Design a protein with these regions (language model features):
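Acidic, surface-exposed loops and disordered segments
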Residues: 1-178
Length: 178
């Protein structure tokens, strides 16, 4: 395999600078400018799963459905990297498409499984791709590298209500055809 992933790890002052710049953009209402399109909405079974995830997560955080301020604070926590001490950004060359992104996805899954096996908590975050220019500037990344996502990581705090969230998975017979 061609190992198409590009990996950038930020800790300390660098992570804080990236976090602060992202939070500032969110607070200023700067539109997201992801390198890749993401669906505005989901329909059918995907929407059902999205809503179930939100209900579970926000429920654990004590945020009611109509609490727009609470939801906004929870959304902002993404850009604050959930106070994790480190974040890894994953990118790939813009010339590559979905078939190569599959390799990158396998790398990301292996990275997260390895972190977990070593007692390190991690949270994959699509929101870390919303302001890719901040990441490119921080690491002096060429413009042809697109940022796919970030993974905040560190030792998990079990007292944080969001960390108690468990999202049910569909039964295998609903996802796999035999």
């Amino acid at each position: 395999n061609i190992q198409p992933w590009k990996v950038y790890v930020a800790s300390g002052a660098l992570k804080d600078r990236i976090r602060d710049q992202m939070v500032a953009k969110v607070m200023q209402g700067v539109p997201f400018n992801s390198d890749y399109d993401y669906p505005e909405t989901f329909d059918g079974e995907y929407r059902k799963r999205q809503v179930a995830c939100a209900v579970e997560l926000y429920g654990n955080m004590g945020i009611e459905r109509g609490d727009k301020e609470g939801r906004a604070r929870a959304h902002l926590r993404n850009f604050q990297m959930f106070d994790a001490p480190h974040v890894v950004f994953i990118g790939m060359d813009q010339a590559f498409g979905a078939s190569v992104a599959i390799d990158v996805g396998m790398y990301m899954q292996t990275l997260m499984l390895s972190m977990t096996a070593h007692g390190v908590g991690c949270c994959p975050q699509g929101t870390m791709r919303y302001y890719p220019d901040i990441v490119r500037e921080a690491f002096a990344i060429d413009g042809h590298i697109n940022i796919l996502l970030g993974i905040s990581f560190g030792f998990e705090d079990p007292a944080v209500p969001a960390n108690q969230t468990w999202i049910d998975r569909e039964p295998i017979d609903k996802l796999v055809t035999f």
